[in-house]
């Protein structure tokens, strides 16, 4: 027992030491210099923001940038949720295109001035990934009509943030963050065609994600239904970026979308019900279905069993069951229910939900 506790404490000490060293390194001038290696490149491809409507909650009411209290926008007393929302800049998608470009660009310029040097909170991997996607996708406000000095500063900041993602993505364990970061890196490569390192490296990481985390049936190895939907959304977004930018779509992206789509049809579209297995929750996939229809994606799957899930139904009753094995330890972070979990749904209402 003493030996075991000593080993655990030693392991924890090593991890803490490793984390401390990493934080020291990333806050150093050496790391800043490493990720600051940028080029004078051109913003070529202008991605359409509506391609992201599967992951962005668009509001009917649009706001003008002038409606926000810009003087206090970077105050330090924000809670974690507010901080993430502010610094990932996804709130730009709710801005009216009649907003002042000059004011919008001033907000970005202010952020760059305050955060040009890496800090672990503002440069969190997920926050940085979404910030890149937002800045590039909202180019009508963030980039168009800007002065040359800001244009250069903007391009350098995007590259610097993308360089940080390239440095970090290989060390991530959370696959959800990896796919979002991968999308941001790939978009950077499509936008700035003069530097192919972002596109080449981003696609290489995407292939690794496919190989390491998706099984041969097109279902995440975690058996996580939420993760399946997230994967499908981002793979389609990446495909649409390739299509819109008039680049050849890699075959493995089409193939992955096909198999993910079949899994999505099996687990959701065939029954139009959320199965609350494995940490899943009530979703709003109806909106995603509209997105798929709008972009011409049709998925079908007539199987009764897939990836360890079984679904039997007639006109009124649906019987669903988890008959698969638990995911391996590497993919079990959010796994909750066990084998033989089942649900009975009648006329659209759940009669029995057994988490196993």
Positions of the model-derived regions?
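Generic structural signal of hydrophobic/aromatic residues within well-ordered alpha-helices
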Residues: 10, 17, 21, 111, ...
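Aromatic-lined, polymer-binding surfaces characteristic
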Residues: 80-257
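Sequence-level motif detector for i,i+2 pairs with an aromatic at +2
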Residues: 51-53, 58-60, 86, 272, ...
């Amino acid at each position: 027992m003493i030996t075991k506790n000593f080993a655990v404490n030693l392991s924890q000490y090593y991890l803490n030491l490793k984390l401390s060293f990493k934080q020291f390194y990333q806050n150093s001038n050496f790391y800043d210099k490493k990720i600051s290696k940028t080029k004078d490149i051109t913003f070529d491809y202008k991605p359409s923001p509506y391609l992201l409507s599967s992951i962005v909650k668009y509001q009917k009411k649009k706001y003008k940038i002038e409606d926000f209290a810009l003087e206090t926008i970077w105050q330090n007393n924000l809670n974690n949720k507010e901080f993430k929302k502010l610094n990932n800049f996804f709130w730009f998608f709710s801005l009216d295109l009649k907003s002042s470009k000059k004011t919008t660009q001033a907000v970005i310029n202010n952020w760059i001035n305050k955060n040009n040097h890496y800090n672990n909170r503002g440069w969190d991997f997920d926050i940085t990934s979404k910030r890149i996607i937002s800045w590039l996708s909202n180019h009508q406000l963030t980039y168009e009509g800007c002065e040359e000095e800001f244009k250069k500063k903007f391009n350098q900041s995007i590259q610097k943030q993308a360089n940080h993602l390239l440095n970090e993505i290989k060390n991530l364990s959370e696959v959800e963050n990896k796919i979002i970061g991968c999308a941001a890196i790939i978009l950077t490569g499509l936008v700035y065609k003069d530097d192919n390192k972002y596109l080449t490296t981003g696609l290489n990481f995407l292939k690794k994600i496919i190989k390491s985390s998706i099984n041969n049936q097109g279902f995440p190895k975690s058996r996580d239904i939420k993760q399946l939907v997230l994967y499908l959304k981002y793979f389609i977004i990446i495909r649409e970026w390739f299509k819109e930018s008039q680049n050849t779509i890699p075959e493995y992206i089409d193939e992955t979308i096909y198999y993910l789509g079949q899994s999505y049809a099996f687990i959701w579209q065939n029954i139009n019900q959320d199965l609350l297995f494995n940490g899943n929750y009530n979703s709003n996939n109806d909106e995603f279905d509209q997105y798929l229809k709008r972009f011409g994606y049709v998925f079908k799957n007539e199987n009764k069993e897939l990836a360890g899930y079984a679904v039997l139904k007639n006109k009124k009753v649906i019987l669903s069951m988890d008959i698969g094995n638990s995911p391996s330890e590497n993919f079990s972070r959010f796994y909750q229910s066990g084998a033989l979990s089942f649900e009975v749904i009648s006329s659209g209402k759940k009669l029995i939900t057994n988490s196993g």
